[in-house]
Amino acid sequence: PYAEYLSEKVWKPLGMEQSASISLDSKKHRIAKSYGGLTTNVRDLAKIGRLYLNKGNWNGVQIIDTAFVERSHTKKYIGSNNGTYSYNWYWGTTDHRYFKDKESLRQYYKAFPSMKIATTMRSNKTGDYAAIFHRGGFWAEGLYGQVLYVNTEKNYIAVFLGADRIEDYCYVFDRLYEIV
């Protein structure tokens, strides 16, 4: 059902170049994962990015509800560890910084006004404040370093493929923001 729905409602309307493969939850149940495990090529992944960049619209046809797309990259869990993750997208795209108190955070923000703060969280263990910055983008990450990045503020998408996970996506996104 999920694979058929995805094929009919998304894959075919977007004119994807190749069939995707979808991971199953287990050999026993064989239920398609809808939360991850989608394997496709770079062009088809870019089409998904374009779909989200255009708020669910593909060449004048609304494929995904605009309200759902907006919710997909809006913060959900203020103050929790999942504060930058929503509907399979990450939106704290620039950097994390830690501050001992709120005043230090305010001073940093005054010094760097272009660094938009997406959310702040206070650590229960250390009492530090973590500020997660945002520059208009959101991204999805694959298991081995595949990344689909969408920046609605600057109107571009980027697809990264890799064989290994890398932990410096935020640095790459920050540099792209400055270049584009």
Regions found by a protein language model. Name each.
Residues 14, 73-77, 177-180:
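Generic secondary-structure transition motif, activating predominantly at the C-termini of alpha-helices
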Residues 1-7, 56-64, 165:
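Structural helix-adjacent loops and short alpha-helical linkers that scaffold large soluble proteins
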Residues 109, 137-180:
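Structured C-terminal helix/loop/strand segments within mature extracytoplasmic catalytic/sensor domains
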Residues 1-10, 44-52, 155-158:
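Alpha-helical scaffold elements that line and support the substrate/ligand-binding pocket
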Residues 19-152:
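Penicillin-binding protein/beta-lactamase superfamily catalytic region
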Residues 3, 7-11, 66-70, 173-177:
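Hydrophobic core segments within long, regular secondary-structure runs in both alpha-
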Residues 1-25, 35:
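A small/polar active-site loop signature that marks catalytic segments
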Residues 3, 38-42, 169:
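Solvent-exposed, acidic/flexible segments
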